[in-house]
Curated annotation (Swiss-Prot):
Keywords attached to this entry: ATP-binding, Chaperone, Nucleotide-binding, Phosphoprotein, Stress response
Gene field: dnaK
Pfam hit, one: HSP70
Entry similarity comment: Belongs to the heat shock protein 70 family.
Listed GO MF terms: ATP binding; ATP-dependent protein folding chaperone; unfolded protein binding
InterPro entries reported in the protein's UniProt record: ATPase_NBD, Chaperone_DnaK, Heat_shock_70_CS, HSP70_C_sf, HSP70_peptide-bd_sf, Hsp_70_fam
PROSITE patterns in alphabetical order: HSP70_1 (PS00297), HSP70_2 (PS00329), HSP70_3 (PS01036)
Induction: By heat shock.
Top-rank taxon: Bacteria
Protein's recorded name: Chaperone protein DnaK
Organism: Caulobacter vibrioides (strain ATCC 19089 / CIP 103742 / CB 15)
Modified residues (Phosphothreonine): T198
Length: 631
């Protein structure tokens, strides 16, 4: 059986590892480096460069050098995050055939999956060169907050690269696997993962080979790229003040600024000051212009202070969801290149009240963890059980636009949940199942993931058909939704994908607005519930009145008709109390009608019993046919 490899497909850098005996080991690439820049370049002659060679020539070929592609994977071209990204990168982002965000290089369009596949191929080739045999299977890591479309797109990238992706594993979970492989003492750890493009935090409990994720949170559009852009903007603004030229409008100059910004950021983790020196960055009528600016660590920290602060909210939420206090955390693991920044380390220490553990390599630990998971799947690593979670609540839209959860956030996966629903109208032959992800009570306030129709429901009064909706989340965090009509056994299902990704603002809005707007949400939900109850009573009363109205007196009938009219008027408004009051009034007014209906049913039932008794012969176990004349 060929070796299963573990790959950390990162925004900025990627890394590949394997299990060497009982220890995970990073494999060097063709250039002898342990990590590979996630950069792909296309040259004029059609040649394709990947990794460091691609990164080296970016300044001279900015429009055809693709980087930070992970930020686009699984997202639609109309996604606000993609719109924001268009102004940040020198290459062109275009709308793909299915509405997804694609990129253009030398006149050809590429999907993010294809570009990611080029990087995965380089990882695969490095592993094959090291092992001396073909590699066909892999475990690939993704941010914990990646949605279903992004996870599916990552699997597709693996497929394009010639890899069967046996498992998609969350990056912080992978880091915890690598950290805790040789530790059996029961520990609660926090993994703080600030990478090139995404931020995740996960709370885990480790003990006796069991790695149980208690909660996860994060931001899918926050990472080193954003830190670089703050430096780029600062340098460009300073140059514009001094020379009157905006370097952001020149793609070649912008690429040089980006490279220098990344270099400055790294240098300032170990030095107090860095001199940015870019000769011949631009020119004006009087000749060439040079950029020379001193950047201090203090200035950098001031520029990115709010970005670092944005990582603390998810940490608070993750602890809250895990039901833990800061003091309950035994160890904080730092992951991702940005966690090397002293200010980031200080922020983590200030929040958790303990110095973070720095014994793991933040650039390699995720790939090492992926290799451990690969070893588990291969059977080389025994007695390791990984229990991960789904990051956001999943559910469907029900009557009145209410979001009905089926699987709550931070539920251990794989998992399967079912619930039975019914129709809203008489003789309804089809239902539309709309799937949402989020934390708000109303569906429209959450992120819609997809929809599908269940057709061929036999005609029946509303509320009679039984439609079973099942959510199935596999170990990769990919969702499948089934709907089944219990009467006909007709089924329909959808694998959730391709509705654009969940941006940082989307996720923050879902969780934070859920707290801030709890009262308003509750009021809206109460209104929908009151209207649903009112309409149900109205419907049943009108039907009963039409069928049994002749069984009550004129006064009672008039009272019921008045109640119906008043409830209809109340239902047109937004006053919850008025709707509830008029609903109760109609229930009271129609009590006589209910008694008359009950009496009529009792009468017919007794008549039927009497007929049956006439035909009974007093003998043991003898069946009597009512239609046969009595002897």
């Amino acid at each position: 059986m060929s070796k299963i490899i573990g790959i950390d497909l990162g925004t900025t850098n990627s890394c590949v590892a394997i299990m060497d005996g009982k220890t995970p080991k990073v494999i060097e690439n063709a250039e002898g480096a342990r990590t590979t820049p996630s950069v792909v370049a296309f040259l004029e002659d059609g040649e394709r460069l990947i990794g460091q060679p691609a990164k080296r020539q970016a300044v001279t070929n900015p429009t055809n050098t693709l980087f930070a592609i992970k930020r686009l994977i699984g997202r639609t071209a109309s996604d606000p995050v993609v719109e924001k990204d268009k102004g940040m990168v020198p290459y062109e982002i275009v709308k793909g055939p299915t509405g997804d965000a694609w990129v253009k290089a030398h006149g050809k369009d590429y999907s993010p999956q294809e570009v990611s596949a080029f990087i995965l191929q380089k990882m695969k080739e490095a592993a094959e060169a090291h092992l001396g045999e073909p590699v066909t299977k892999a475990v690939i890591t993704v941010p914990a907050y990646f949605n279903d479309a992004q996870r599916q797109a990552t699997k597709d990238a693996g497929k394009i690269a010639g890899l069967e992706v046996l498992r998609i594993i969350n990056e912080p979970t992978a880091a915890a696997l690598a950290y805790g492989l040789d530790k059996n003492d029961g520990k609660k750890i926090a993994v703080y993962d600030l990478g090139g493009g995404t931020f995740d935090v996960s709370i885990l409990e480790i003990g006796d080979g069991v790695f149980e994720v208690k909660s996860t949170n994060g931001d899918t559009f926050l990472g080193g790229e954003d830190f670089d852009l703050r430096i780029v903007d600062y340098l460009a603004d300073e140059f514009k003040k001094e020379q009157g030229v905006d370097l952001r409008k020149d793609k070649l100059a912008l690429q040089r600024l980006r490279e220098e910004a990344e270099k400055a950021k790294k240098e300032l983790s170990s030095t107090a000051q860095y001199e940015v020196n870019l000769p011949f960055i631009s020119m004006n009528a009087s000749g060439p212009l040079h950029l020379n600016i001193k950047l201090s660590r203090a200035k950098l920290e001031a520029l990115v202070d709010d970005l670092i602060a944005r990582t603390i909210g998810p940490c608070e939420q993750a602890l809250k969801d895990a039901g833990l206090k800061k003091s309950d955390i035994d160890e904080v693991i730092l992951v991702g290149g940005m966690s090397r920044m002293p200010k980031v380390q200080q922020a983590v220490q200030d929040f958790f009240g303990r110095e973070p553990h720095k014994g793991v390599n933040p650039d390699e630990v995720v790939a090492l963890g992926a290799a451990v998971q690969a070893g588990v799947l291969q059977g080389d690593v025994k007695d390791v059980l990984l229990l991960d979670v789904t990051p956001l609540t999943l559910g469907i839209e029900t009557l009145g636009g209410v979001f009905t959860p089926l699987i709550e956030r931070n539920t251990t996966i794989p998992t399967k949940r079912s619930q039975t629903f019914s129709t809203a109208d008489d003789n309804q032959s089809a239902v539309t199942i709309r799937v949402f992800q989020g934390e708000r009570p109303m569906a429209q306030d959450n992120k819609m993931l997809g929809q599908f129709d269940l057709v061929g429901i036999p005609p029946a009064p509303r509320g009679v058909p039984q439609i079973e909706v099942t959510f199935d989340i596999d170990a990769n965090g990919i969702v499948q939704v089934h709907a089944k009509d219990k009467a006909t056994n007709k089924e329909q299902s959808i694998r959730i994908q391709a509705n654009g990704g969940l941006s940082d603002s989307d996720i923050e809005r879902m969780v934070k607005e859920a707290e801030a707007n709890k009262a308003a949400d509750e009021k809206k939900k109460q209104l929908v519930e009151a209207k649903n109850q009112g309409e149900a009573i109205l419907h049943s009363t009108e039907k009963a009145l039409a069928e049994h109205g002749d069984k009550v007196g004129a006064a009672e009938k008039t009272a019921i008709e008045t109640g119906i009219t008043e409830l209809k008027t109340a239902l047109e408004g937004e006053d919850v109390e008025a709707i509830q009051a008029k609903t109760q009034a109609l229930i009271q007014a129609s009590m006589k009608l209910g008694e008359a209906m009950y009496a009529a049913q009792q009468g017919s039932a007794e008549g039927g019993d009497a007929k049956a008794d006439d035909g009974v012969v007093d003998a043991e176990f003898e069946e009597v046919d009512d239609n046969k004349p009595a002897a």
